[in-house]
Each structure stands twice: as C-alpha cells, then as structure tokens.
Design a protein with these regions (language model features):
Chain B
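N-terminal pre-ligand scaffold of iron-sulfur
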Residues: 1-57, 71, 75, 84-103
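Short Gly/Pro-enriched turn/cap motifs at secondary-structure boundaries
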Residues: 79-81
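Short cysteine clusters
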Residues: 43, 62-65
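Short helix-to-coil "ATP-lid" hinge immediately C-terminal to the conserved N-box Asn in the Bergerat
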Residues: 68
Length: 412, 103
C-alpha cells in the first residue's frame, strides 16, 4: 500500500477537504497530508451560515469541523491563505501563488464552488450581499435589524433560508424568483408550492415568474426593479442565484470537465493520480445510473470520505442516493432522490410526498419527517416497484413495504 | 441510580423508538431485535431527538443529519457525529419496562 514517505496534497480546505484529510488518517494513511485553503479559516461547514448564524444564535466559528489544534494532533499540515495556482501533472506537483512547488504522490481536488453573480448587478453597492463564506454570513447577520426591508433575489434554498432567518428577526421580506415556482431545480412544483405556502404564512411576499430588471441605489441600495415595472424598496438585497463549480485549476492542467469536473465512482479525474470530491465534481452515480453534480452537505462529506479511502488503497465506489435538508421557519425539510418532470406525485399524509416513475420511488420530500425520509431512502435504493395506494396508506409502515417487495421479488 | 418505569413501552414494535422525559432527562427508549435500549435522546451534533430517527442494524440514526449511534453503547458510528451519547440500563419485568438513571 502506501509508504510513510508518500504525500497527499488536498487543494481546497472546505468541508470536503477537511473530511478527506480526516478520513485519510481514519483509513490508516501514514504519510504526509497537506491541506491548502484560500480562506484564513480552518475547514468549516456551510449549513449554519444561512440559519443559526443569521439568527444570531451562534457565531460563524461554530461551523468549524475541528479546532485548529486537532489538525496538528493528526499530523495534517494546514496551509491556510494559500492559493494553488497550477497543477503540473507530469512532475506530480502543484504550484502555489507564492511560487512554491509542492510534490504529491496523489492529489485530491476539493475546490468547491463559488457564487454565480447576478448579471447586471452593480458592483460595490452597500447592502447588496451574496452568501457563501464565513465573512459573508457575519456581514449579513450584522445587517438583519428588525423593520428593515430585505429583497431576496432567487427562490432556491439559500434565498429561502435567508428569507426565513430574516423573517424570524423581524425584517420585511420579499422573495423574487424568475421561474414560476420556488426551488425550481430541486423539487416538483406541487411540492414546492407547500414551501411557498409556508413562507406566505409567515408573512413573506413572494414574486414568482418575474425576473429582476435592475438594482437601484447610490452608494447604498435603495430598490429592486422587476421586469414587470414593479419597484421594491430595499434596505438590503441578498442574491442567491446558484453556484459555479471551481473547475478551472484542473481544466488548465488538462482534466476533462463537463458541468463539473468529471470523475468516476472511485472519485478519479481523467488525470493520473488526481482525484476530486465535493461540489466541484460531476460524478457517475451507480444507483441513479447517471451522472450528477450535487451541491450538498452530504456529497461534500461522503464523496470526500470515499475519495480518501480510494486514495488510501481501498477500492470502494461512491454510491449514495442524494439527500438534502433545509431548515426554514421552524420546519425541517428533507428530500432524498432526484426530481423528474414526468414524476407522479403521491402524498402520504400532509407532510410526506413521493415522486414515482413507473411505480418506482425516485424521490421523497418530508416536512419534519426525518425518520420517514430515511425509510424512503431504503425504498429508493432497493429500486423496487411499490403501488401508489400502499405508499399513500399511513397505516402501512414504509419498512414493511420494503420487506413485502423484497419477499415478493424473491418468490419465483 | 434508580429505576423508572416507562409507561406504554409495550406498545413499541421491533426497531421502533419512543421519546420521553424521565427525571428532567430526555430519553429515547428503543426496542430492537428483542432487546431494549435506552439512550440520551439528544444528538451530540446538533439539537434533534434521536427517538424520531431511524433504527437499523443495531444503530439509531439521527433524523436531522443521519449521524448514527450504536444502540448498545451509544458509540458514534457515522459522521457527522463524533461524540457518543450516554446509554442507560433497561430491564423488563412482568410486562413492564424500567430505565435506570443516574441521580
């Protein structure tokens, strides 16, 4: 396997980079581990940045994976505020912005993603925020004062979590989404409508199906003008219109990229001894039988762990049903699987919905239904057919549906 | 240490859990594979009740982020949890279930 002189270089010290370093040691990798990050913070997770940090319940520092001393204890060299500028695959080395050349035995890219800018948004206007980093979150949290008017541009998860936190802090909130429904990429419209009702019930104004024309202000933001001519006065604007995977470093070195850095189920890029994990990848999912690019906590953590194990010499495919959660207005929303426009939607009570294709469960979305979502994941993994009627019947345990189907499948 | 009866425990099916508060302490009582287990009911990662989670293969999985704890020991078995949850002794006598809690 690996000799003590081997050196793994990890580029990107976010959640994925941090978890990968941890998993390398967990797998018994004895060599050097170098973790390069552009930010000044040790690896942290982002979910809290749009929730508890904005609510003022905890500081952004609570999002750290481990305290700094932990890395020293594990023999993981943290190289913070250090940008890797280039990869030289032939000499198996990376080059930092300072011109330092660092050789690797294997390289793991956890370069993540960056916010997608809203085209036409003015630069340097006070009160206009994006939310991605530790500092973004602290800056925004400081501006969430009761009575102020917030316009959120983008009805995706980030925008809605910001809207939720701001409503709970007493701001007047309007969410603008150019698509006709919230969470357009993530959920079938019928289920997303439930999320819209939740926000409306808590007093947020929703403007769906209308794009933003321009943001007005002079030094500080004053209003958001919509394409239909409406002008929304604003003290604060938060833009959440998606993220872009940071593929350029690997692309420049010759790696293949197609809506994310292309990796196989063992997290290998098309460059020899170069692996990738987390937001940046476009990977083959053996359960879904197709390629996906995921922007989730689960993927950042578990694909990174899978990559680390493969680097350490195990051969284990990364194969999980995509799972995601969001906390909004006191409701924990979880989804497992992937949406499809052709899905049949089946409700099981008021708080759990399934998406079916040819009687197979492909998606489940729950509102304060964590335990049931986990059972639903099993149904998706098993790729069995389940009659919609049984699924809708709350008297039938989801676990029992799995057993029934397994039994009938094994009967000749 | 003292034993506390758990009312309604017998209604639990296999691999099911109930949440309760005993002596101001949140407790998850679990029936799994013919055995009873009692754990502190709050996940060590972020606030969530384990009794609302999923039970499988001798572990209970947190409903919030899917961290797993071993039922018998409370040991962390899957990220993001790294700290164990306390576990408490359980006994079943004459159709009644009791949990032993520290004073």
């Amino acid at each position: 396997m690996t000799s003590p002189t081997e050196r793994i270089v990890i580029v990107g010290a976010g959640q994925a980079g941090g978890r990968a370093a941890e998993a390398l040691r967990g797998a018994g990798f004895p060599g050097e581990i170098l973790l390069f990050g552009e930010e000044r913070h040790e690896p942290y997770e982002r979910p809290r940045l749009s929730k508890s940090v904005l609510l003022g319940e905890e500081p952004a520092s609570a999002a750290a994976l481990h305290p700094r001393a932990w890395y020293a204890d594990k023999g993981i060299a943290l190289r913070m505020r250090s940008r890797v500028e280039a990869i030289a695959p032939k000499s198996r080395s990376v080059i930092t912005a300072d011109g330092e050349r660092v050789e690797y035995s294997k390289l793991l890219l956890c370069t993540g993603s960056r916010v997608r800018p809203l085209s036409g948004a003015p630069e340097g206007l006070a009160g206009v925020h994006y939310l991605r980093t530790f500092e973004d979150s602290e800056r925004l949290a400081a501006g969430l004062e009761p009575g102020r008017r917030l316009v959120v541009i983008g009805g995706g998860f980030i925008g809605l979590e910001v809207a939720s936190s701001a409503r709970r802090r007493g701001l007047a909130v309007t969410v603008v989404e150019r698509q006709g429904a919230l969470l357009d990429r993530a959920l079938p419209a019928e289920i997303a409508a439930r999320v819209a009702s939740l926000h409306a019930a808590h007093g947020a104004a929703l403007r769906l199906g209308v794009p933003v024309a321009r943001i007005h202000g002079n030094g500080a933001v004053k209003a958001v003008e919509l394409a239909d001519g409406a002008e929304l006065p604003a003290d604060l604007v938060v833009i959440g219109v998606g993220i872009i995977p940071n593929t350029e470093l690997a692309e420049t070195a010759g790696a293949v990229s197609a809506d994310g850095l292309v990796v196989d189920e063992y997290c290998r890029t098309t460059l020899e001894d170069v692996y990738a994990a987390g937001d940046v990848t476009n990977h083959y999912n053996p359960i879904l039988e197709r390629r996906v690019r995921l922007e989730s906590w689960q993927n950042a953590q578990n694909q990174a762990i899978a990559a680390a194990r493969n680097i350490a010499g195990e051969r284990r495919a990364y194969a999980e049903v995509p799972w995601f959660w969001s906390d909004q207005l006191g409701t924990n929303i979880q989804m497992v699987g992937v949406p499809d426009p052709a899905m049949q939607i089946v409700w099981r009570g008021e708080r759990l919905a399934f998406g079916l294709l040819q009687d197979r469960v492909r998606l489940a979305v729950g509102f304060d239904m964590g335990g049931e979502i986990r059972a639903a994941r099993r149904l998706i993994e098993a790729r069995i057919t389940v009659p919609a009627k049984r699924l809708a019947d709350t008297a039938v345990r989801l676990k029992d549906l799995l057993t029934e189907a397994t039994c009938s499948a094994s009967t000749p | 240490m003292s034993w506390h009866e758990v009312p309604g425990a017998e209604a639990l099916g296999d691999d099911e859990a109930m949440g309760l508060v005993l002596k101001e302490r949140p407790v998850a009582l679990v029936r799994s594979g013919g055995a009873w287990h009692a754990l502190h009911n709050v996940c060590t990662h972020q606030f969530a009740l384990l009794s609302e989670g999923y039970i499988e293969d001798g572990c209970i999985e947190c409903p919030l982020h899917q961290g797993r704890f071993e039922l018998a020991t409370g040991a962390p078995k899957a990220p993001p949890v790294t700290e164990p949850v306390p576990v408490y002794p359980v006994k079943s006598e004459n159709g009644k279930v009791y949990v032993d809690l520290p004073d």
